[in-house]
């Protein structure tokens, strides 16, 4: 069991309860020096008592819960001390335990110990951080599934298939003279193809994961006075942007966040894109163009009550290669625009003023970012997972080509299969380095 660590596990500030958490060798004896109860402390019981300082003066009263190894979050002996949530009390308790021999925990160190002690694999440990930082109900649901091992269930069988292949290759080398069962070339290719197929399915979730974690960057773009700011306000359901009939009212971008059926969206209302001699407006137009480049999805807004202009078509040419939705606004005034100019496009007709068509627009946004996320998402991969999966796939594609065309030696086959297996093992934390663990757990809050 490792040295004792201690941290305040609740957010800083005044509250009804504040928790001081300890884990490691001898933590119960350490805490008992200062926390006195009338009864013997038993694991998993709540014990009321008094916390005294190092001079024997009463500091606070509270409740102690002891978790005996290995039946704890970290897999070590743990103590959680529930005190009144006064920052001064919690800080003083922290000082007491540090002076008595505990070390201040590093960010994420409790979860790191849980991983090192086999209580969680690395994808589950990462899910703890995702769960704590979840900004939407959908993000919370998916993080909880991954904490329960949902992602691991998809990756571990792929690695086991590669390890099974490795075992056959090693047996072929070690017992070449003996009559043992071997796989045909076709069987090997089939097994590798099965792993590649599984990797491809996981890679499809990378974009979804990015959207759930960071939000979809959604830019509203169009010429001046087509109702971009009105649409911005309608989607936000509040009057955030100034709306007038004067072209060029919005001179700089405005950015807000909202949720569309559980998906976080970073919505940007851009300045109307046009040629202008006004210096301030020109700067706003350039900044708007930068936001267009950064956007995951563009809402290209036209005024359905007017003819399509050359300015509309010029902006459309600039954005049509990016993911976009054509939004015909102001349909409540009648449709005079020749929408055939956008032949082949799915055009969503809305009235930002009346609120019509907004539900259809929301559905179209979800389709563009990857499907109805609220119902279908069980797992998603992070950038770290995506990088390792792509590396594993690259190695397996190379192996398959060489195995089929060049009839590579068993020794070379072993190297490729081992490398691909190790990449998958790194996702699960079965292959790790201290640098990797330090990088992952440093993003956690202290006390978790």
Swiss-Prot record:
Binds 1 potassium ion per subunit. GO terms for biological process: tRNA methylation; tRNA wobble uridine modification. The keyword Magnesium applies. K(+) binds at residues 225, 244, 246, 249. Its main location: cytoplasm. Its cofactor is K(+). Mg(2+) binds at residues 229, 250. Its EC number is 3.6.-.-. Homodimer. Heterotetramer of two MnmE and two MnmG subunits. This is tRNA modification GTPase MnmE. It comes from Aquifex aeolicus (strain VF5). The gene is mnmE.
């Amino acid at each position: 069991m490792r040295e004792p660590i201690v941290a305040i596990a609740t957010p800083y500030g005044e509250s009804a309860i504040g928790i001081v958490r300890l884990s490691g060798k001898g933590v119960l004896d350490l805490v008992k020096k200062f926390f006195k109860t009338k009864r013997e402390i038993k694991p998993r019981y709540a014990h009321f008592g008094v916390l005294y300082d190092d001079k024997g003066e009463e500091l606070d009263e509270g409740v102690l819960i002891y978790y005996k190894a290995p039946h704890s979050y970290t897999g070590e002996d743990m103590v959680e001390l529930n005190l009144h949530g006064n920052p001064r009390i919690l800080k003083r308790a922290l000082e007491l335990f540090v002076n008595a021999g505990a070390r201040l925990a590093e960010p994420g160190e409790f979860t790191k110990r849980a991983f090192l002690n086999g209580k969680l694999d690395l994808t589950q440990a990462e899910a703890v951080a995702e769960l704590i930082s979840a900004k939407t109900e959908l993000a919370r649901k998916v993080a909880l599934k991954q904490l329960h091992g949902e992602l691991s269930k998809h990756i571990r069988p792929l690695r086991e298939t590669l390890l099974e292949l490795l075992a056959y290759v090693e047996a072929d080398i070690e017992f070449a003279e003996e009559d043992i069962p071997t796989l045909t070339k076709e069987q090997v290719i089939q097994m590798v193809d099965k792993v590649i197929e599984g990797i491809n399915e996981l890679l499809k979730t990378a974009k979804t994961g990015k959207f759930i974690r960071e939000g979809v960057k959604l830019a509203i773009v169009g010429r001046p006075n087509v109702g971009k700011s009105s649409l911005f306000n309608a989607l936000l359901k509040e009057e955030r942007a100034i709306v007038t009939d004067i072209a060029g009212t919005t001179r700089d971008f405005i950015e807000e966040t909202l949720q569309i059926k559980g998906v976080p969206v970073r919505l940007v209302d851009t300045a109307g894109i046009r040629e202008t001699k006004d210096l301030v407006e020109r700067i706003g137009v350039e900044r708007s163009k930068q936001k267009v480049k950064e956007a995951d999805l563009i809402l290209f807004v036209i005024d359905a009550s007017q003819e399509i202009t050359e300015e509309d078509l010029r902006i459309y040419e600039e954005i049509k290669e990016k993911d976009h939705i054509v939004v015909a606004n102001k349909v409540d005034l009648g449709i005079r625009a020749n929408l055939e100019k956008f032949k082949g496009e799915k055009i969503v007709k809305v009235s930002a003023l009346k609120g019509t068509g907004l539900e259809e627009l929301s559905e179209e946004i979800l389709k563009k970012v990857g499907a109805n996320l609220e119902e279908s998402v069980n797992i998603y991969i992070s950038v770290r997972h995506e990088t390792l999966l792509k590396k594993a796939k690259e190695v397996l594609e190379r192996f398959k080509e060489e195995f089929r065309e060049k009839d590579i030696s068993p020794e070379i086959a072993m190297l490729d299969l081992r490398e691909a297996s190790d990449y998958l093992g790194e996702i699960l934390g079965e292959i790790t380095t201290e640098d990797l663990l330090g990088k992952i757990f440093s993003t956690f809050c202290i006390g978790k």
